[in-house]
Amino acid sequence: MRSHSCGDLRSDAIDSTVLLSGWVDRRRDHGGVIFIDLRDRSGTVQITVDPDLGAEAFAVAEHLRNETVLQVEGRVRARPDESRNERLATGEVEVLAQRLKVLNAPSRNLPFAVSVHDDEQVREELRLRHRYLDLRRERMRRNLSLRHQTVQTARRFLEDEGFIEVETPVLTRSTPEGARDYLVPSRVCGGEWFALPQSPQLFKQLLMVGGLERYYQVARCFRDEDLRADRQPEFTQLDMEMSFLDQEQILDLNERLIGRIWKLVKGVELSLPLPRMTWHEAMERYGTDRPDTRYGMELVGVSDIVADMGFKVFSGAVAAGGSVKCITVPGGNDKVSNVRIKPGGDVFSEAQKAGAGGLAFIRVRDGGEIDTIGAIKDNLSDEKKAQLLQRTGAEPGSLILFGAGDTATVNKALDRVRQYLAKELEMVPAEAWNFLWVVDFPMFEFNADENRLEALHHPFCAANPEDLGDDPALWSERLPTARAQAYDLVLNGLELGGGSLRIHDAALQNQVLQTIGLAQEEAQEQFGFLLEALEMGAPPHGGIAFGLDRMVMLLAGEESIRDTIAFPKTQQARCLMTSAPGGASDKQLEELHVASTWVEPEEN
């Protein structure tokens, strides 16, 4: 139905006859001659319909609507110099139509304009409800093409490195230590349930036990969790696992993979090796394990300076075992008013969202003198002022914001304020790609609600041998404070991927499961197949998974992963196009041995 794609025509096709098929992007009537922008996936080309050269074609062109599916036969010619369009890849040529055939025409009004010439901002709800139309738009075509290019680049790289692609089950069993599972009732095994995988974690480890050595998969994963702009109930991971490599070898391989993707997809040459930072350093300097290193305003600890101050907010926090930290905002003296920092202000609100009661502050005036208000002013001696200036390195014109309280809350609040002010004050450089490996995570964190330890990543991460030692009798004592051989790749403050070396010893895996509160019987019920496999000669192995949706979002310069997925869900986990999820008939539920207890809420 076509000899060429619309976007492929160039000057070397001049004087040739072509057959094109696509959509009418725009139609313009210029005093008897009609111009049509014909669009397909490859791009757009101008069609010229002259009644003197094709009366039948002109009669068809007079009645065309935008988004009509049209076939065009015609001759390629050079555009006149004055009408060439350098913004269009096909802008040097046009097709003089000899025959037009309508393949299909819209029979109803379109909910929004699709044309690449129309900059209309369409509500996301409308775009998702009519996603098949939205996919015709240049933005979505470009994003999905970029996604394809990213996946193909990764596949070629991994295959060159000796990896093989293996699919793992989508119907599996529910396991603890993760988000909520999506459950699928079994018709054959009444009263029993499958779970959709949150990741291929256990299966890829079993592939290593099976001797495959290097595995990868573009894996579909499912998590029933509260959604944000960068989360979906179903998402895609570039997942891999490898045997007989240590942590540095895994990091080296994966940063070469990332370097290849950024070079071929974005034309950006990354400087390798990528920087490393320990989890402890990241928390101290940035208050988060996903630090954005494109700008300054790092957190600075000042607990030792303010511990003996009369200002109770500071001294009380230190006495209670907490911390006092601060960030220095360059130029903040003039740009951030007191009103914004006090209750009701936007900066105060950001700190409050992170659990902080508020922020203290001092200003460094243009002459270098320190100015502040309230109780902190009455208790800030000249000696303390000098110590704070030296510790923070604050220049004249700066604003110093303080957080005080338990360390976790202080870190979270100052991290949030730091990110907020960096955007507000336009401190984030454009087109910066700041990659960072964060390493040496703790193996466990304390869950105060359940009064137990839980795995920070997952309970299959290997411990740092320096912390664990060689004596199994000491594992139970040393594991709670051990570092994991885990690593996350962070880009511009977002987690791009994460992984670890895995436990390949059954006794140690059992001990870790006990550490997170699983009794022996429960561990066997949940993970017996893995523990059995580890007893049969499991090799040292490790892996990583990259969030493909988020990676493409960053490569495409989008704000939401929904703009990098063909058919995404909303933040309420609904598909507006198909109205999924939907109900099930009584017969279907009966076959599945399931009864619904859902009661529609009463309308007020």
Curated annotation (Swiss-Prot):
CDD domains: AspRS_core, EcAspRS_like_N. PANTHER family: ASPARTATE--TRNA LIGASE, MITOCHONDRIAL, ASPARTYL/LYSYL-TRNA SYNTHETASE. The lineage of its organism: Bacteria, Bacillati, Cyanobacteriota, Cyanophyceae, Synechococcales. Residues 201-204 are annotated as: Aspartate. L-aspartate binds at E177, R223, H457, R502. The keyword Cytoplasm applies. The keyword Aminoacyl-tRNA synthetase applies. It comes from Synechococcus sp. (strain RCC307). Keywords: Aminoacyl-tRNA synthetase, ATP-binding, Cytoplasm, Ligase, Nucleotide-binding, Protein biosynthesis. This is Aspartate--tRNA(Asp/Asn) ligase. It catalyses: tRNA(Asx) + L-aspartate + ATP = L-aspartyl-tRNA(Asx) + AMP + diphosphate. InterPro entries: Aa-tRNA-synt_II, aa-tRNA-synth_II, aa-tRNA-synth_II/BPL/LPL, Asp-tRNA-ligase_1, Asp-tRNA-ligase_1_N, Asp/Asn-tRNA-synth_IIb, AspRS_core, GAD-like_sf. GO terms for cellular component: cytoplasm. One of its GO terms (molecular function) is aspartate-tRNA(Asn) ligase activity. ATP binds at R223, D224, E225, Q232, E495, G547, L548, D549, R550.
